[in-house]
Each structure stands twice: as C-alpha cells, then as structure tokens.
Amino acid sequence: MAKIAVFFGGSSTEHSISIRTGCFICRTLHTMGHSVKPILLTQDGGWVVPLQYRISIPYEAVNSSDLFEEEFQKTNGVSKMDFISNLDADIVFLGLHGGKGEDGSIQGFLRVLGVPYTGSGVAASALAMDKTRANQIFLQSGQKVAPFFEVEKLGYTNSPEETVIKLMSLGFPQFLKPVEGGSSVSTYKITNQEQLSRQLALIFESDSKVMSQSFLAGTEVSCGVLERYRNGKLERIALPATEIVPGGEFFDFESKYKQGGSREITPARISKQEMTRVQELAIDAHTSLGCRGYSRSDFIIVGGEPHILETNTLPGMTETSLIPQQAKAAGITMEEVFADLIEIGLKHSIH
C-alpha cells in the first residue's frame, strides 16, 4: 500500500466543496488500506496538517474520522517548503476544485518538485479552466458549442457601453461567468440589459476576464471519463451519463451541492443513440484537452444533438457527486477508480 497525501480546500470559491471532496477521498483511501495524510490548503494560502500528525503520530492514527474533525479545529499552519521537505508521500491525491488547484498552478508546483500527483497535467488543467480557450479547442475538434464572447476587464473599463452592446447580440437569456471558474459558483443567468450591466460590474471587481454564452434550451447531461491500465495498455471509458433536472432555473451551485437542489438521474433518460454520442464526445473532449486520469464533461442536448458546455479536470468527489454516481451505475467501485488514478499518476511521473 502507498503513502498518499490528500490536498483539499484551497483559496478558490469552491473551498467548502473541496473539503467535502477531501474527506470522501481520505475515507475511501483509508478503507483501501493506504496510509493517508490529509493536507488542508486554507483560503488565505496556508498549508495545514493535523497537529498530532506533525509530532510523529503514525499515518494510520490520523485516519480516525473523529480525530480528523477535531484536529482541523486546532491546527497551526506550516510553510510550503517545510511541508514539502517532510511530505514523505508516494503520491499526492488532488481533491482541489477551481482556482489555483485546478488551473495548472498546483500541478506545476508538484511537477517542479518531482512529486507524483493524480489527475491532469499542467497544460490540460490550464486549458480546461480557461472556458474560452476550451471552447475554441472543442470547436476545432468538431463539437457543437453555443455562441459565446469573451470580454477582458480592460476593454470593459474603457467602454462599458460597447461591451454591453456586444454581449446583447447573444440574445437573452445568456449565461455570464468568469473565464476561469467552476461549479457554477459565479455563473449568472442574464435576462435583460440592466442585469447584464450590473453583473458585469460585479464580476470585474474580482475577475479579469468573463465569458457570456447564449442560452440553449434542452436536456442537460454530464458524462465522466475514466482512464485505466488493463493488460498493460491504457484505455479510456465513458461512464453512463447523468441527466440533470435543476431545482432552480439552471444547474447552479445550490442545485449541485445542496440536498434536494436538483434531481440527478443516472443513467440519463435519453435515447441509446444520444447516450452513445454523449459518451463519444466526452472522450473526445478529454482527449482534445489532453486530460489524464479522469474528467467530466457537461452537455446540453438540443434536438438530439449534444452541445458541450465545459470539461472539469478535477470533478467533485463528494458523497453526492456525479462521478461516484456514474461509476456505481457502471458497476465500478470508487476503490477501483482511485486505484486506477493512483496507478496512472505514478506511471506518468516515471515517464
């Protein structure tokens, strides 16, 4: 069994989601018999490990759920360099979402240090996080994408009125979001010019680029892709897609992570042909971006044609997340999924 450090938390708006993901990963890895070291990345940039672990409590001792919860209430931060020099882990399992945890930053940090990690590499992480660049790659690979525009803060500051007029050409409703973001934390459904002007000003208070995209009415589905080695060969498989029935106007943050916020139906209630097509396109998106290990792509099916929305390189791994739901529907345990992710991370570091 391996010594595995689990990174979760982070400074992004998805901090709370990542904590839930980290807890799920730690518990699952522990049931697999691995030695688990939970590492909380705080919102202010600190790196925290359970206090008793840092005074040489064995790996196994920090796997108690009670100790885990109690110790994170009274931890002290450690510097990144002190932490890395004493990491003593075979691989880092990334349970981060959004921001520097998913945009290639932490991946680059670990790569420079020569520390193996799970999930996609630097380039794929950065491309997938940049919604505009990702859409351009999807279009080049032949995928259908709803019309969109990107706006930079400088252009908006110089001419707010022209920016609003440009985005109005997409029609209403439209979806406005930061170019680099995930989990629909800052995604807004815009229905009129006044709302568009107001939300642009608000988003640019904290983000440098935004993207707005035309609304598509249809069936929303999400499809996970897993990589694994079988008989010495790497293979990619698409999981059964999940149909998303939002409790609100769209599948926003509340719908994704609040109990009862949405209905998630796995497998999706779509035709066999549509399911096959969605799975093919999910693998295509995974491959086009250069993802590794796993990913999850979201689509809207309009008139039988899937239109891709985005690809997540570090999809959620909470109790209610879609990848665990889809793996279960495919007869694959999360222990199998995690074992494959670890194997791929270790093999890639060797190459």
Curated annotation (Swiss-Prot):
<keyword id="KW-0133">Cell shape</keyword>
<dbReference type="InterPro" id="IPR011761">
    <property type="entry name" value="ATP-grasp"/>
</dbReference>
<dbReference type="InterPro" id="IPR011095">
    <property type="entry name" value="Dala_Dala_lig_C"/>
</dbReference>
<keyword id="KW-0963">Cytoplasm</keyword>
<dbReference type="InterPro" id="IPR011127">
    <property type="entry name" value="Dala_Dala_lig_N"/>
</dbReference>
<dbReference type="GO" id="GO:0005524">
    <property type="term" value="F:ATP binding"/>
</dbReference>
<feature type="binding site">
    <location>
        <position position="310"/>
    </location>
    <ligand>
        <name>Mg(2+) 2</name>
    </ligand>
</feature>
<dbReference type="GO" id="GO:0005737">
    <property type="term" value="C:cytoplasm"/>
</dbReference>
<dbReference type="Pfam" id="PF01820">
    <property type="entry name" value="Dala_Dala_lig_N"/>
</dbReference>
<keyword id="KW-0460">Magnesium</keyword>
<dbReference type="InterPro" id="IPR005905">
    <property type="entry name" value="D_ala_D_ala"/>
</dbReference>
<dbReference type="Pfam" id="PF07478">
    <property type="entry name" value="Dala_Dala_lig_C"/>
</dbReference>
<comment type="similarity">
    <text>Belongs to the D-alanine--D-alanine ligase family.</text>
</comment>
<feature type="binding site">
    <location>
        <position position="298"/>
    </location>
    <ligand>
        <name>Mg(2+) 1</name>
    </ligand>
</feature>
<keyword id="KW-0479">Metal-binding</keyword>
<feature type="domain" description="ATP-grasp">
    <location>
        <begin position="135"/>
        <end position="343"/>
    </location>
</feature>
<keyword id="KW-0464">Manganese</keyword>
<keyword id="KW-0547">Nucleotide-binding</keyword>
<dbReference type="GO" id="GO:0008360">
    <property type="term" value="P:regulation of cell shape"/>
</dbReference>
<dbReference type="InterPro" id="IPR000291">
    <property type="entry name" value="D-Ala_lig_Van_CS"/>
</dbReference>
<feature type="binding site">
    <location>
        <begin position="167"/>
        <end position="222"/>
    </location>
    <ligand>
        <name>ATP</name>
    </ligand>
</feature>
<dbReference type="GO" id="GO:0008716">
    <property type="term" value="F:D-alanine-D-alanine ligase activity"/>
</dbReference>
<feature type="binding site">
    <location>
        <position position="310"/>
    </location>
    <ligand>
        <name>Mg(2+) 1</name>
    </ligand>
</feature>
<dbReference type="GO" id="GO:0009252">
    <property type="term" value="P:peptidoglycan biosynthetic process"/>
</dbReference>
<keyword id="KW-0067">ATP-binding</keyword>
<keyword id="KW-0436">Ligase</keyword>
<comment type="function">
    <text>Cell wall formation.</text>
</comment>
<dbReference type="GO" id="GO:0071555">
    <property type="term" value="P:cell wall organization"/>
</dbReference>
<dbReference type="GO" id="GO:0046872">
    <property type="term" value="F:metal ion binding"/>
</dbReference>
<dbReference type="InterPro" id="IPR013815">
    <property type="entry name" value="ATP_grasp_subdomain_1"/>
</dbReference>
<feature type="binding site">
    <location>
        <position position="312"/>
    </location>
    <ligand>
        <name>Mg(2+) 2</name>
    </ligand>
</feature>
<protein>
    <recommendedName>
        <fullName>D-alanine--D-alanine ligase</fullName>
        <ecNumber>6.3.2.4</ecNumber>
    </recommendedName>
</protein>
<comment type="pathway">
    <text>Cell wall biogenesis; peptidoglycan biosynthesis.</text>
</comment>
<dbReference type="InterPro" id="IPR016185">
    <property type="entry name" value="PreATP-grasp_dom_sf"/>
</dbReference>
<keyword id="KW-0573">Peptidoglycan synthesis</keyword>
<keyword id="KW-0961">Cell wall biogenesis/degradation</keyword>
